[in-house]
């Protein structure tokens, strides 16, 4: 009879960054499902001079179509989900604590896009004092994170496009009300399921 077993070992995780030294603000941005950090980072190119940028990559990489071609990554699936959540949080905390130790005066802004939003919310929940601001973008708020977890939260923002195909109008209103109840400032922009540079700039002002 076979039974599930586990083993622990050290491993590397990949992230992308620009020059952090001398930057007073650092943006950590978590990509969505099926994206790679390298290409997701292009959406933030306009911030390269003013902000330190850190783009972690989800641990699960896969072919987007069939068994070859373009590759994407995700933060988790439904399989062994709780363990992935725990390991993602440990990985991201280790990364951010290292960055903070090397850039003690910098303020850290955390953004999660789409699937990365749930990972960002859990990370913020675990150590809210590390972050100046939490920005969740086109993401459903994770049900395992409660209102009480954000009682002492800093600045909270939620952004969504008015033509986002993943949020039908009725569902979108429910999502927006959830974020309002949590104390998030709502930003709706003209667009679909994507990062809008103008809206992002307004949030970061």
Predicted features and spans:
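Hydrolases whose catalytic domains are alpha/beta-hydrolase-1, hotdog thioesterase
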Residues: 119-123, 145
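Active-site signature of alpha/beta-hydrolase-fold catalytic machinery across serine-
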Residues: 42, 122-126
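Serine-hydrolase catalytic machinery in alpha/beta-hydrolase-like enzymes
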Residues: 5-20, 24-103
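A conserved short beta-strand
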Residues: 129-141
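Short beta-strand/loop motif that positions the catalytic acidic residue
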Residues: 157-164
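Catalytic nucleophile serine of serine hydrolases
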Residues: 32, 114, 138
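C-terminal catalytic histidine-bearing segment of alpha/beta-hydrolase fold enzymes
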Residues: 169-176, 180-205
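Gly/Ala-rich beta-loop-alpha elbow adjacent to hydrolase catalytic centers
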Residues: 111-116, 120
């Amino acid at each position: 009879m076979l039974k599930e077993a586990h083993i622990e070992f050290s491993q590397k995780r990949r992230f992308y960054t620009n020059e952090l030294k001398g930057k007073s603000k650092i943006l950590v941005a978590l990509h969505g499902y099926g994206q790679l950090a390298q290409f997701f980072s292009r959406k933030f190119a306009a911030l390269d001079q003013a902000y330190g940028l850190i783009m972690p990559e989800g641990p699960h990489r896969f072919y987007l179509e069939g068994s070859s071609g373009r590759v994407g990554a995700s933060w988790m699936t439904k399989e062994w989900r709780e363990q992935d959540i725990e390991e993602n949080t440990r990985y991201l905390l280790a990364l951010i604590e290292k960055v903070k130790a090397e850039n003690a005066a910098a303020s850290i802004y955390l953004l999660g896009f789409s699937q990365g939003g749930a990972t960002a919310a859990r990370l913020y929940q675990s150590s809210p004092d590390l972050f100046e601001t939490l920005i969740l973008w086109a993401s459903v708020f994770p049900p395992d994170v409660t209102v009480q977890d954000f009682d002492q939260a800093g600045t909270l923002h939620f952004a969504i496009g008015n033509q986002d195909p993943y949020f039908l109008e009725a569902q979108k209103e429910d999502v927006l009300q959830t974020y309002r109840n949590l104390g998030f400032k709502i930003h709706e922009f003209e667009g679909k399921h994507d990062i809008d540079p103008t809206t992002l700039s307004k949030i970061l002002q």
